[in-house]
């Protein structure tokens, strides 16, 4: 008999949930508050009250064996000797409007628990009690119903009978998928050099994950050069392993939309190579981009009275899902939008619901790693998941940002102003918090007086003195790690700051619930979100964080900065069976394993598949691009770029460590060589602007084009200009992050951890940007191109040791004349 695992809550909500999506404010931290209230009620329930009772049972319906699992809030025996299942719900519904029929799902959930418990305990009758806790008034309303064991079992049987067609659909699909994946062939005539090795590493990791310790699963880091075909090399073996029972679902997670498109293309290639392939894939798109009915400002307005796609969503979603599941199996943003319009449902929520029925889920890193927006339906507990983490070199900085938070004192002042005249508990709380932040601002300004020194970010990395200073008398700052120019860094978070903000939380929440139509609602809602972010970060705060306070005029900015995301990334990856993290630049591997919480993971580095003679690699070590030498370096850099561009007609890119330096060199270059066409990256570009820039780099150019871009920016990685669309690039400088106090905190932290502070904070991230930029050249075995390195530090051992093996033929040249000769020799061969 076929069997299927089915969480009880999923069963009930899928069948019985009705109504609309309604994102109006109702307390966005109700999950945590609800858990606290559950514990509170369970604690006072009495000695015989069993809390959080796990229930599991095998139940047959329509020829399917359902494995049902769930957790009853409480089980107790009442004064009449009747065993009672207690289902606790928190609600913002006014107390007088709480009725027995408030939500049929609540009764159904309790009744399913009761059916299982009565069957297993041999009880002829059972009671189900709904306990509603009104969070605004702390009032409790209880309803109790008596059921016979026969009634409960009949009810459960009816639910499973209703669900059986959906279960059978999934079982049939699983069988088709397994058979289809077993027959899946690599979609190209042959593997590129290195592809088979990468595929083997991913396959072995997925296979090992089947029997791995569920506390972490198996993990592998794979560095594979650009052009090897990493997307297919990771996706294909993971699907083969999944077809062998080594995973129920595959999550392909990326840092950028362009990489998501590559994953979609790889799935499409597999389908075209094997017609009839049974594989469902969905791409999750941010709500703002997926929304079909934004408000006047372009934001989603998820209210039933405003959005027709939100109104009645849960009444129509099963029809929309059925239509999709009967279709092609490829669910892109466009496909979801088409179905959403057809059935008048929200495409964003439809994508989330559809993901439960799909084999491959493609999306951003945040769907796994972000503590706020991660997919709770999958990752709140460990599951049989496979993770493919693309462009994993981006994950450390992204993860740090996800676990950090910031708050500005001015948001308190502006909130008070928005409330207008009159007294209220919210105004009182805002005033008190504002006073605490005012005292902290004064203490910060006194501890770190402004000196008018050189702006942060415009120096080279050197040892910054971290000197403690005296705090203001009315706010005791802990001993600073750093204090300069209005900015203080602290290891210890001053408890008074999060405490003052927490005191605002409840009255603000009450105000938002009671004043949904107030003109200030949107502004105060933003304040609420900021308070939530700070509260979450404060709850996580430990030795992996530092506190930054910055005083500017009347403003005080509070930042809780995650320096080391390792434990949080580790916990997220532990939700799955296996994880393969891959990129063209994971050098050195120990650095990435350590900062991503995978110190014991296997790491492999694959050689370049391309002939080394196809890459001309040259360096002019006579040029220094350090900040204090940049102005003097401009003529030499411009001369080197001219030599590069004149070496052969074609398209080139020059990458710079900052936009200001780029502008300096560009102006000098354009003035001296106006006959060479140029293109300059603008400071801010949207997707259309990016596409327009890249479109200038066409195939078979009749004239030379030199593009000026920022290293580490949108053109420094994820750009695939094959053939003669790009035949050379210059990399100006070693890519070190700009010096600022935050970067120095990273240096300090990792110096204490491993003695490698400069490497972890500066050298390794910088070299990553260099290698990514260089990887834009030579994308296929037939390509031929040049990489020119401009900086004396490329000749120093500490930097040169980070070069990949296929860079061993680098030529260090004494000047521009030698470069011209070397380029001629390269292009003539």
What would you call each of these model-derived segments?
Residues 621-632, 683-794:
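Conserved RecA-like P-loop NTPase helicase motor core
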Residues 234, 261, 341-360, 365-499, ...:
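Signature of the SF2 helicase/ATPase Hel1-core->accessory helical subdomain module
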Residues 173-223:
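Conserved pre-motif I regulatory segment
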Residues 336-361, 371-378, 507-624, 632-634, ...:
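A contiguous, basic/glycine-rich beta-loop/short-helix subdomain that forms a polymer-engagement track
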Residues 57-154:
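Mg2+/Mn2+-dependent nuclease catalytic core
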Residues 178, 185, 214-215, 246-361, ...:
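A substrate-engagement module of RecA-like helicase motors
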Residues 657-682:
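Conserved helicase motor "Helicase C" RecA-like lobe of SF1/SF2 P-loop NTPases
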Residues 1-78, 82:
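Metal-dependent nuclease catalytic cores that hydrolyze phosphodiester bonds in DNA/RNA
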